[in-house]
Amino acid sequence: MNVDVLLKNVWLYQTVTQTFVQRNVAIKNDKFYYIYEEENVNLQPQKTINAENQWMIPGLIDAHMHIESSMTTPTIFSKAVVRYGVTTVIADAHEMANVFGLEGLKAFMAAETELDIFHAIPSSVPSTTPELETTGGIIGLAEVAELLKEPKVICLGEAMNFKGISYEPDSLIRQIIDLCQKQRPTMPLEGHCPKIEDQELADFLYSGITSDHTHQFPKTLKEKIEAGVFIQFQNKSITPENIQVIVDNDFYNYASIITDDVMADDLLKGHLNENVKKAVHAGLPIEKAIYMATYTPAKRMGLHDRGEIAPGKKADFLLLNDLESFDINTVYKSGKVVFEKGEPFHYPEKIEEFPATYQQTIQCKKLTEEDLLLKVATTKETVRCNVIQKQEIGTFTERITKEIPVENGLLQWQKANCALLIVMERYGKNGNISFSLMDQPLSEKGAIATTWAHDHHNLMVMGNTIEDILLAQNELLAMQGGYLVASDQQVMATCPLPIGGILSQAPIEQLGASLQKVRQAMQALGYQNMNEIMSFSTLSLPVSPAIKVTDFGMMDTKSQRFYPLVFPEDGVLLHENTH
C-alpha cells in the first residue's frame, strides 16, 4: 500500500485512553491511514520520518473565539496561529456583524485560510436591543435563516441577552433560538451567562442553550456542569481553584480550553497553546489538557472527522520536542506541513479584499470644549452622581455614588477625582452622545479613545482633562478608528484599525507592536488591569456585569435599566445630547 507519510516510533497521544503510546503512524492523502506497533507491515511511504523522540498530538481546536479580537483579518490570523498548533477554530464574528451586518460576515466567511475556520451565527447583534445600543448591522431572523444554509456554520454563537432569553418569550433572541432548533435541531447553542446561578440559571438553560465561556468561579462552575452546561475555559477562568473542580469531579468530558479573545500583541507570543500550558501549570494533567483542547471541542461542535489520531480522521497534528514545555516542532494540516520550528512568520500571499467603503466608517462629529461642559440645574452646592468603578482583575464593574461639586451651574467632576467617559454613535444613525463618570481610572493626566468598543463599536473616549479628551477624540476620528492614548495634549500611542474601526491588514508584527505601545501608554497613565485593552473596551459592553455604557447612557446590564448621571432628587443634567 502506498502512503504519503510514515512517522516511525513516535510517542502518540491515544485519545481513547488519554495516554501516550509508541506507535508508527501512516498518512494517506489528508487522513490518518494506519496506526500500528509491529514492523512487518507492507507500506511504501513517499516520506519516512523517524520521530522516536517526539510526541504526536491532534491539532488544537478552539471552539469559541473571535478573530476580530486579534484586530486582524482571517488570512493573516490563520498564518499567525497555525505556528501555535491551532488547526481548527470556530469563529463568532459578531464584531464584524455589529459593524457591517450580514455583508461583513460573508466577507469574513469567504476568506481562504490554511487552518479550518468554521463559523457561529452571531446571535446577539446587537448584544441587547436597538433601544439600548446603536450598531451598524443587525442580525435578525432573515439573516439567521440565510446563515443556517451555510455549510461552514456549525453553531449558534453566544446568546448574551439574559433578560430576553429568560423572561421575554417574544424577544428576537428567543425567536432566533427557536428558528435554529427547528431547522438544525442538533446544532449546539452557545451561551454567555456570567454570575447566573440557581433558578435564574435554570431559566436561562430552559431555552436550549448548553454552554458558557464567561468568567468561572468554583461554586457556580460545579453547579453549571451538573446542570448540563459545557464549560469553555478562557484564560481568566484557568485558575488552580477551577481546575481542582474539574479534577476532583472527573469533569473532563464536560469542558474544553478556548481563547475567546487574544489581543494582537499577545498573538505574537501564543494562542490556544498558551492556555493549554496555563491549565497544566494550574494543576490539569497534560494528557487531560490535550484532551480538552482537541477531542472535547471536536465532539461539542459535531466535528467527528477530527480531534483524535485514528484511521479515517483528518491528519491535523503536532509534533512536540518536549511534552512538559509543549515545545512545538512541526504542525501538520491535512497531512501537509504548515509550520516548522524556526520558520519566520510569512505574510500571506493573498489577503481579503474589502470595499473602500469599509475604511471610511466613523461618522461622529468632532467634539468641542462646549460639548464637554456638563451643565446642571440644581440649588445645591454638591450633587450625588452615579459613577462607574472598574476592577483591576477582569472586566466587571460596579456602580458607586459620589458627591460632586457644582460651580456656576457646571458639574466639577475633575475635583471629585473622576474621569469623563463618553460614547458617541458613529454610524450616522441618530447622533447619540452619552456621558458617564468613572472613579479614578487614571493616576496621570490623559485620555484614551477607541472604536474597538464591544460590542457596538461606537466611538468611546475617557479622560481626566478636557484638552486630552478633545485631542484623543479628534485624532481618532481623523484616523478613522482604532486605539489612541493622549497625555499633556500630545498623542502618546496609536493603533490604527481602518477597516470598520476594528481591523487592520498590517503585518501582525507591526499591528502587535502598535497595540503594545498603546498598552504601555495606558499603563503610564495609571490605567490598571491585568488586560488593559479588554478592560477598557468592555466598559461599553451592555451584557457584562454590572454597569456599562452605550450611546444611550449608563446601564445596569442585568435589569437593562439606565441610570441618570445626576440623582434626580439633586438636580438635572442640562445637556442636549445626553441620554
Curated annotation (Swiss-Prot):
What GO terms describe the biological role, i.e. biological process, of this protein?
Answer: adenine catabolic process
- Which InterPro entries does this chain map to? Adenine_deam (IPR006679), Adenine_deam_C (IPR026912), Amidohydro-rel (IPR006680), Metal-dep_hydrolase_composite (IPR011059), Metal_Hydrolase (IPR032466)
Q: Which cofactor does it need?
A: Mn(2+)
- Primary enzyme class: hydrolase
- Is the keyword Repeat assigned to this protein? no
> Which reactions fall under this protein's catalytic activity?
adenine + H2O + H(+) = hypoxanthine + NH4(+)
Q: Please provide, alphabetically and separated by semicolons, the GO molecular function terms listed in this UniProt record.
A: adenine deaminase activity
Keywords of the record, alphabetical order, are: Hydrolase, Manganese
Assigned protein family: Belongs to the metallo-dependent hydrolases superfamily. Adenine deaminase family.
Q: Which PANTHER family match?
A: ADENINE DEAMINASE (PTHR11113:SF2), N-ACETYLGLUCOSAMINE-6-PHOSPHATE DEACETYLASE (PTHR11113)
- What is the protein name given in its UniProt record? Adenine deaminase
Q: Which gene encodes it?
A: ade
